[in-house]
Amino acid sequence: DNQRPITCLNTMYKWYTSCLLVPTDKHLDDYDLMEGAQRGARAGCSGTMDNLLIDRMVTLDCHRKKRNLSMGWVDVKKAYDSIDHGWLEEMMIIHRFPTWLCRTTKYLSRSWSTRIVVTTRNGREASEIIKFRKGLPQGDALCPRLFTVCLNPIAWKISASEGYRLSKPIGTTITDLLYIDDLKIFAASESKLSSVMNSVRAAMEDVGLIWNPKKCAVAHFKRGVRVPESTGLLMSDGNVKIPTLEDGQQYKFLGVLETLRQEEKIVLRCAAREYLRRLSVIWSSPLSDYHRVIASNQFALPAMSYFMWTQHWPITELRQVDRDARKIVTEGGGKHPCGTTSLLYLPRDKGGRGLRSVETEYKETKVKAAVKLYQNRDPAMKMVREFEEQAESKGYQSMTKEAGKYAEEYGLQLQLKHPDPVCVTEEGEVVPGDKLKTRLRKLRESRMEGVVEEQKWQGKLITARKEDGDLNTEQCFWWL
């Protein structure tokens, strides 16, 4: 049951399906056929970030306004491997794709096959060709889009439900969050949630998708407080029961642990533990110092940076994570115990080590997240903008408030106006949103250089090298 074979697709097939993806997306965009709640496999859309922001908005609205809310999380067994090919062909016709594209997809689905090759002492032995009678291969560009097309009618059905209506003055209804096959359903009561989940389960079985009850869950809240006597959700056929989240139990949705609200403290603790674990592996390895830093920035740091876009963490705890990280680097020989901390985060071409700070990464991510929120043209994100502005005006924790505070530390003033937010420097220069990342990096490096220049030991040495006319600064640091 736990086997999930992945077939290695050849390069020409991947290139061919990438070419087919262009007219497929164009047809869906031109006729607005994709349900808006489906934010997976969509070009130019940060699906997980958008869904988590909407999820945070709904749960905070329930908590702050003492509202009734029922939520259901749905997990599907081997979703990609279960799509019926007949349903795929029917969906291509229902969505009125061009005839040539329907025929091509039909031909591809009927030609999907593989073979198992085993290397033994007697040589290589190959099995007969194994035909795929159902399911979509993983690894090409087209199949994720075909999968979302197959789920489109289910998304339409959920969007027709009553859902959960946000408090005034927003007052918009949220029915569900969908990212590929990760589904979360909202309802105003337990009975309404039961009705929606029964209809969704029946519709998914028509597609060939089977729920995994052990990984599904429901939670009910009245006046913002969890209902303790809830015993779970019994499906209409009486054979499947969806368990209720118990006290102290969380559900992981799109990588974030949550109950009524997203558990930001637990997420930070788990992310920091994984980040430090990866750092320990990297700095105890035989890699060179340069590659250790690259691995730390590109392998270890993403364990935390993924959550920074949507979570709100205390700066004091992030500074503690940085201290623990520097301790690991020092024990691994990447920093002298008496060495200056600033040089550790200064770029290598300027005499530093090039490591990225968790605190700095968090602050810059918050500024970029606020700008990205106001650049987003998704109609659903308008609600998030209004919610964040309303939270800021009432003194609640807000992304826009945090972003403005952190931008001021870089000498920038945020002007968040949809759809073209900008930053204004102290000199009055206007920085558009698409150039903000580069400007933040330059300001960070400039500020770090200023800190290093004030140091009386290593900083003085670095500054002397830069000011010495007989030395080439670039050649001095190229070996780093």
Where are these regions (language model features)?
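Inter-domain linker/hinge segments that demarcate the starts of reverse transcriptase
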Residues: V22-H27, N51-H63, K192-G208, A272-R277
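Basic, alpha-helical interaction scaffolds
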Residues: D237-I315, G333, V367-M383
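Catalytic palm subdomain of template-directed nucleic-acid polymerases
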Residues: K78-H95, L136, D176-E205, K222-V225, ...
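Short, conserved secondary-structure transition motifs
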Residues: C45-T48, R110-I116, C216-S230, L346-G351
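Conserved pre-catalytic core of RNA-dependent polymerases
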Residues: D1-P153
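Extended C-terminal regions of large enzymes
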Residues: V321, H336-L480
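Short amphipathic alpha-helical coiled-coil/interface segments
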Residues: V200, L318-T330, A403
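Short, conserved micro-motifs composed of acidic
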Residues: I210-Q249
